[in-house]
């Protein structure tokens, strides 16, 4: 494999922010390269370097995304899954592991009983005895018990598999410092290559999605899914506390980033953002 001069690649994207906006310095740098007699050979070298950077970045991003998912699914179905199922069914299986599961199961069973009662009221002349109703309720309760017992076992599998996936992701990050620097350079070149309007659009999209007026509803759904995935109780107090503080923290970090960094790197993008946001 050919070793490229990566120092030159990362220099433009990781240099400290100076008093002159980067767009102006890039314009002078482009003008200097056009007057350079060795500009053609440098352009070919930069193209090869850019292609190597793109291929390496795409491969490493794909590896970071796919490897933890594959490890998660493989460990869940082939390693932790059989062990958890065996231990879970050794004795009387525990149906519920938190109060939220009980509440959902009881509510679903109550709706089923009310549905049967409603059917009886609609058809009073039908041959539906109390024994038949009781049997249907018992079958439904048994079905709910099996469903939530499997959900409880799957929550334990999810916790173990997620821990292993996080460990694999951290290991890839630690052992891939060189690739990470290339990916950072690649992403920075993509971001700074966008027009000011595109940058402002992405900023508004991100802020409205995660810290905007309707974001609490999305955060509520996300937290409920995560808690249910891990088998944790879906505490409404915790969810409301999270969605009332975390978006505020994100909004503060975002505004500081605009003031401290983006305002010096691309002031025209900040001006476009303020004009579009008004």
UniProtKB/Swiss-Prot annotation:
The chain crosses the membrane at residues 61-81, 155-175, 203-223, 238-258. Coiled coil: none annotated. It is a multi-pass membrane protein. One of its GO terms (molecular function) is antiporter activity. GO terms for biological process: potassium ion transport. InterPro entries: CemA. GO terms for cellular component: chloroplast inner membrane. Its main location: plastid. Contributes to K(+)/H(+) antiport activity by supporting proton efflux to control proton extrusion and homeostasis in chloroplasts in a light-dependent manner to modulate photosynthesis. Prevents excessive induction of non-photochemical quenching (NPQ) under continuous-light conditions. Indirectly promotes efficient inorganic carbon uptake into chloroplasts. Belongs to the CemA family. This is Potassium/proton antiporter CemA. It comes from Porphyra purpurea. The gene is cemA.
